[in-house]
C-alpha cells in the first residue's frame, strides 16, 4: 500500500505547495491526526519527510479513506480550498467522462446482440447486487461478491447491463466512482501487464488520470468476468504476488493479487465464474457473498418474445412452442440464446414455414438458424462463398474447443481460412462479435454457437483435414465429452449426435451441396459398443446424463435402443425437470441392465408447477424394473420420497421379475411411512443392504431387526452408518447378532452408540452362535471405558476378524487394554483399525511401538 500511494494521489496536490506551505501543512497534519484519534506519526519523521516519504508515512498509519479525508481538511485549514475544490471537481469530471464512454460502448455492444432493450430484464438482480456490494449502516469493509452459474447462462450480459445502469446513475449512487471490467478470456492474451495498464485499456483517451482514479480505492469496483478462462495457481505464496499497481506481472499473477486483496485491498470486487471453477477456488479467496445466476425466468423469456414480435398472438404462439419443449425452454434461460431462438422462429414464421418442425430438438433449431444466417435474404440457397465461410468457421470453432480458446485474433481466423474481408460479413450476420478488449479479436455469439460449429466440423471433415495438431479424432472427442474431461464442453457431444439425425443431415446436404457419409453412424455405434462394454476400464467414468442427452438429441429409435442395450450398469442423477424428460426417454429404450442407480434429489417435491408431468415421467423411469428383468443391484441415493412418489416406485419394483441381491438407500429421506420400504427388504432374497445416511426411527429399527431375525434372511452385509440410531436400537441389534446366521459385516459408524450401547453388543458377540466377521464402529463416541468389554470379544468370540475404532476417544488406558488382549494366544482378530490423530503424543508413541510387534494393528494417519 505504501508504494501505491507514493506513486500518485497526495503528491499530485502537495506539489502545488511551496516549501513554507508544505512545512505548515505538516504541522497541521500532526495536530489533525492527534485530534482524530488516528495512529500517531513521529514529528521527527514527518518534519524530515519529502512529499513521497510523507505519502508513505500517511498510508502506513491510516487507511486510504482516512488519509484522504485528513489531507483535504488540512488543505482547507491552510486556505487552499482551491486545491480541494479542484480535486473534487476533477474527480467528478473524470468519472462523468468515463461513465459516458462506458455507456456508449456497452450500449453499442448490446445493440449488436439484441435489437431490443433487455436492460430492464435484470432489475431484480441489480437490486440484489446493490444490497450485497453496498455496506449496511456503519459497515465499511470492502466486498467481494461471486456470481456463479453454468457457462453461457448470461453472467456477462448481466454484468455489462449492470455497468450501463451504473453509468446512468441508477445503482451504487455515491458508492463507486469507477467500475472497471476485466474478462479473463480477453486479458489472458496479454503476456504481462500492470493494474494501471488494464485500467488504461478501459479509458476513453490514451492517458488515464491514474493518480486520481487510484486516490480513493474504496470507491473502485473491479469486475473480473469468467474466472474459468484463466489458469490459477492456488498454491501461490503471498511473496509471489504483486503489491504495486504500477508493477508489470503475468496477467494471472496480477489478477490473483487483486483477488487475494494484495493490490488495493480497500476496493470492492464482483467476480463471475462457472460453478466448477468456483468450487476449485472458493477456499483460495475471501469472498463475502455468493449468488447463483440461473438466467432468464419464464416472464423474461416471454417478454423477449413479445418485444421481438409485433403481433402479440404470433408472439404468444411462438413462446408456447418453446414453453412446451423443456430443452429449448432451458437453453432460452441464456439471454443471448433466448434472443437467437426467438429470432429464428420469427424468421421461419415470416417466411411462411412451419416453426413446429425446427423445435423437434435443440440441435434442429440451431441447424436451421445458423444455416439461414449464411443464406442471403430472399435467396433459396447459399453462395459458394457462404458455404466456404461457414466451413472455415467450423475449422476455427473446433480448434478453439480443443485449445480452450474462445477469443480469436486475426491470425487464428486467417489460419482457418477466414480472410480480413470476411470479418464484416460474420459481424453483420451476428455469428461473431468483436471482443470488448481488442478491436482485432473476435468471439462467437455464444459458447453454444462455437460448440455447434465445432460439432459440425466432425460431420463434414476428418481431424486429418485440420492443420492444428491439437484437434483429435472423433473417438477422443466423444470420450472427452462423455467423461467431462473438458468441463466447458456443455453441448458439443449432444450437437454431434443431434446432427446425425436424418432431418439434420438433409439440411446440411442441401446447404453444402453434397452427400454426407452414412458410415459415421455405424462407426459411432461400434465405438460406443466398445466403450460401454462392462470390461472397458473407462466405462465407469462415463457421465450417464451426458450420454443420455446425446441419445435424446439424436432421437433415432433403433440406434438409441442398441446403445442403451450396450450398458449393463447405469447411474442416473436427475437435477431438474429437463433431466427427468431425457432420463425417461432413454431408460424406456433399454432392457439389459443388471445394476441400476437413481438419484432424484428433491426435484419431485420442488418442481410444484410440473408435479403432474413429473409423476408421469417418474412412472416411465420406474418402469425400468419391468423392462430389465436381470437387475440384481439397485441404488437409490440423495433422494427425497413423498408418499405418491414412493408408491409408484414400490408398485413397479414389487410387480417386477427382478431378483435383487443388493439394495442401497444412501441418504434417502422418506416424507411418508417407511413400512412399504421395509416390506421391499423382506420381499427379496437380499444379500447386501446399505442404508447409510437414511434416518431410521425406533420403530423402523424394530421392523428391520424383525426381518433380520427371520430364518430365511440371507443378508450378509448391513450398513447402518449415520442413520441416527437411538439408544433402544442396540438391544434390537444385539438380538440380531444372537439369532442371525448369515450376517458377516455390520457398520454402525457415525451413530451415538456410546459405551453402554457397545456393552450390549459385546454381550451378544461373546455368544457362540454369533456369525459376525467385521464390525465398524467409527465415530461412535466411545471412550476407554468400553475397551474391557470389547477386548473380551477378541478372545471369547472366534468369528470376529476385523474391527474399526477410528475417530473415537479411547485414550491411553483403552489402547493399553486392547493391545494386551491382542497379544493373547486365543485372539483370532485379523485387523484392528485405529487413527493416530485420536491419541495424545504418549499414546501415539506407545501405538507405534505396538505396531512393530503386532501386525493386527492398522493405523490411519489422516485427520
From Swiss-Prot:
- Mind listing the GO molecular function terms for this protein? ATP binding
Q: Where is the NACHT domain?
A: 143-466
Q: Where are the LRR repeats?
A: 618-643, 683-706, 717-740, 741-763, 765-782, 797-824, 843-863
Q: Which domain of life is it from?
A: Eukaryota
Which keywords fit this entry according to its UniProt record? ATP-binding, Inflammatory response, Leucine-rich repeat, Nucleotide-binding, Repeat
Give the matching InterPro entries: DAPIN (IPR004020), DEATH-like_dom_sf (IPR011029), Leu-rich_rpt (IPR001611), LRR_dom_sf (IPR032675), NACHT_NTPase (IPR007111), NLRP_HD2 (IPR041267), NLRP_innate_immun_reg (IPR050637), NOD1/2_WH (IPR041075)
Q: Does the keyword Nucleotide-binding apply?
A: yes
Q: Which residues bind ATP?
A: 149-156
GO biological process per UniProt: inflammatory response
Residue span, Pyrin domain: 1-93
Q: Does the keyword Repeat apply?
A: yes
Q: What does this protein do?
A: May be involved in inflammation and recognition of cytosolic pathogen-associated molecular patterns (PAMPs) not intercepted by membrane-bound receptors.
Q: Which family does it belong to?
A: Belongs to the NLRP family.
What's the protein name? Answer: NACHT, LRR and PYD domains-containing protein 4B
